[in-house]
Amino acid sequence: MLLTIDVGNTFTVAGVFEGQNLLAEWTVTTDPNRTMDEYGMLFTQLMARAGFSSGQVTAVAIASSVPPLVPTLEWMCQKYFNLKPLVVGPGVRTGMMIRYDNPREVGADRIVGAVAAFDKYGGPLIVVDFSTAIILDAISARGEYLGGVIAPGIVVSADALFQFAAKLPRVELVRPPRALARNTVHAMQSGIIFGFASLVDDLVERMMAELDPEGKGCKVVATGEQAELLAGECATIQYCDPSLTLTGLRIIYERHQAHARGGR
């Protein structure tokens, strides 16, 4: 059984695979102040509630957008699972060529999502990750990572409105009944939900013009914590796949293992 852990700036998503099947998935708050033991107890308890034991885990793969947490999770894996995890980063074979000025600048989560998306949907392709930031990544028809766009996420933007506009309340991030709002809460929800959907559609169209100028068929897939909330509001998004990064971790782990066996 493979345990996959995707550490984002706001949330950490974990899942267990048996072969290609995702058996269970959990989302917890990312907290750099948690200790190795706190993370160990958290993951083992979540697994136990789903009917799994730590002894069933034979491998761990990690992608992290929070570098200080990597050593904590590595120690946690060694203590609670008796395993050395595969941490996706420079030097790990992903099977994807990275066409970026400095490949080391690209976050592991972006590459992991791109690998899974190309494997599942083919290219050319744009991956829209609705997380702490909204990140759009482009993959060529040949499976090359070409770069992308980073914009503020909806939670960050909503919090900024609450913090810096004295009369605006903190609002629940849900779809309002209409775009033309008749109260402040709905007006903020309209601006956030419909506004960011329009932002994504415009960015996708601009990227498509460069990625697929002949219009042969560029696919667009959404992932991330807010994917299910926003994907349906975006005219350009064709697929919604919230578990994309976990799938990418599985694929990269399998490729890494295949390369290690071939190298012996």
From Swiss-Prot:
Substrate binds at residues 100, 107-110, 184. InterPro entries: ATPase_NBD, Type_III_PanK. ATP binds at residues 6-13, 132. GO terms for molecular function: ATP binding; metal ion binding; pantothenate kinase activity. Keywords: ATP-binding, Coenzyme A biosynthesis, Cytoplasm, Kinase, Metal-binding, Nucleotide-binding, Potassium, Transferase. Its main location: cytoplasm. GO terms for biological process: coenzyme A biosynthetic process. It comes from the Bacteria. Pfam families: Pan_kinase. It catalyses: (R)-pantothenate + ATP = (R)-4'-phosphopantothenate + ADP + H(+). Its cofactor is NH4(+); K(+). The active site is at residue 109. Its EC number is 2.7.1.33. One of its GO terms (cellular component) is cytoplasm. Pathway: Cofactor biosynthesis; coenzyme A biosynthesis; CoA from (R)-pantothenate: step 1/5. CDD domains: ASKHA_NBD_PanK-III (cd24015). Coiled coil: none annotated. K(+) binds at residue 129. A monovalent cation. Ammonium or potassium. It is found in: Cytoplasm. Belongs to the type III pantothenate kinase family. Catalyzes the phosphorylation of pantothenate (Pan), the first step in CoA biosynthesis. Homodimer. This is Type III pantothenate kinase 2. It comes from Symbiobacterium thermophilum (strain DSM 24528 / JCM 14929 / IAM 14863 / T). The gene is coaX2.
